[in-house]
Curated annotation (Swiss-Prot):
Alphabetical list of PROSITE patterns matching this protein: RIBOSOMAL_S2_1
Recorded GO MF terms: structural constituent of ribosome
Keyword Ribonucleoprotein tagged: yes
Keyword tags: Ribonucleoprotein, Ribosomal protein
InterPro entries listed in its UniProt record: Ribosomal_uS2, Ribosomal_uS2_bac/mit/plastid, Ribosomal_uS2_CS, Ribosomal_uS2_flav_dom_sf
Segments forming a coiled coil: none
Residues spanning the signal sequence: none
Gene of this entry: rpsB
Keyword Zinc (UniProt): no
GO annotation, cellular component aspect: cytosolic small ribosomal subunit
Highest taxon, organism lineage: Bacteria
Biased composition (Basic and acidic residues): 232-262
Organism: Halothermothrix orenii (strain H 168 / OCM 544 / DSM 9562)
Protein name: Small ribosomal subunit protein uS2
Length: 262
């Protein structure tokens, strides 16, 4: 069964591409037709490719892998935060800071600084410092929280990056490709599909379209995590089965020895 129905995609406006003069010829295979100067995306391909992306993300999540959600333009910011938090994954929904992946060591230092500032406030240190210094420290903390708050628990580089608009997030795409991190992305008619590993042809401007697709990626993470949990829960049982089989084998061997002696 498909992850989404054609009706859901139509209702969310996933089929609306960009104006025909603003297209990337490489997207030709994913375009159904043209209507009033706007390209209409082939939703049959969207259904099939979203299924493929869903399966991939679910499988990665089932192995305990990290999927980084990225969407910094206005239409995606709230959705990215909501869906990433819902499935317990890191996210970037404000400005992408250059080097977030390629210079991750420095980013980790900035996250450490954010944690230090928050601890200072919790410990009441802000109350004894000069007022001007506290204002500057709070300003620094707020800025770090805004840009790095979504990745503060990301201890290592992500295993997959999910992006809502590869043109807007061109730096994130370039960094992920440089580090050979697979990219799952919504790809509109003005994008280059060759840069993406798992493409989802669709409207990257409509809030409802971004929300629908992003929610399915989050669902895939949750389904994968549930599978991982079930596997871990099954492990003790497997050990019990192995123990039982060994004991059964031992009893059989003892019986055989007794029969031979008789």
């Amino acid at each position: 069964m498909a992850v989404v129905t054609m009706k859901q995609l139509l209702e969310s406006g996933v089929h609306f591409g960009h104006q025909t003069r603003r297209w990337n010829p490489k997207m030709k295979d994913y375009i159904f037709t043209e209507r009033n100067g706007i390209y209409i995306i082939d939703l049959q391909k969207t259904v099939a490719l979203l299924d493929k992306a869903y399966d991939y993300v679910r499988d990665m999540a089932s192995k305990g892998k990290t999927i980084l959600f990225v969407g910094t333009k206005k239409q995606a910011q709230e959705t990215i935060k909501t869906e990433a938090e819902r499935c317990g994954m890191p996210y970037v929904n404000q400005r992408w800071l250059g080097g977030m992946l390629t210079n991750f060591r420095t980013i980790k230092k900035r996250v450490k600084r954010l944690n230090e500032l928050e601890k200072m406030e919790e410990d009441g240190l802000f109350e004894v410092l000069p007022k001007k210094e506290v204002i500057l420290l709070k300003k620094e903390r707020d800025k770090l929280e805004r840009f790095l708050g979504g990745i503060r628990d990301m201890k290592n580089l992500p295993d997959v990056v999910y992006i809502t608009d590869p043109r807007k997030e061109s730096i994130a795409v370039a960094e992920a490709r440089k580090l050979n991190i697979p990219i799952v992305s919504i790809v509109d008619t003005n994008c280059d599909p060759d840069l993406i590993d798992y493409i989802i042809p669709g409207n990257d401007d409509a809030i409802r379209a971004v929300k629908l697709i992003s929610s399915k990626i989050a669902d895939a993470v949750l389904a994968g995590k549930q599978g991982e949990q079930l596997t871990e829960e099954a492990k003790p049982e497997d050990k019990e089965d192995e123990k039982g089989q060994a004991e059964e084998k031992e009893v059989k061997e003892e019986n055989n020895s007794a029969n031979k002696e008789e």
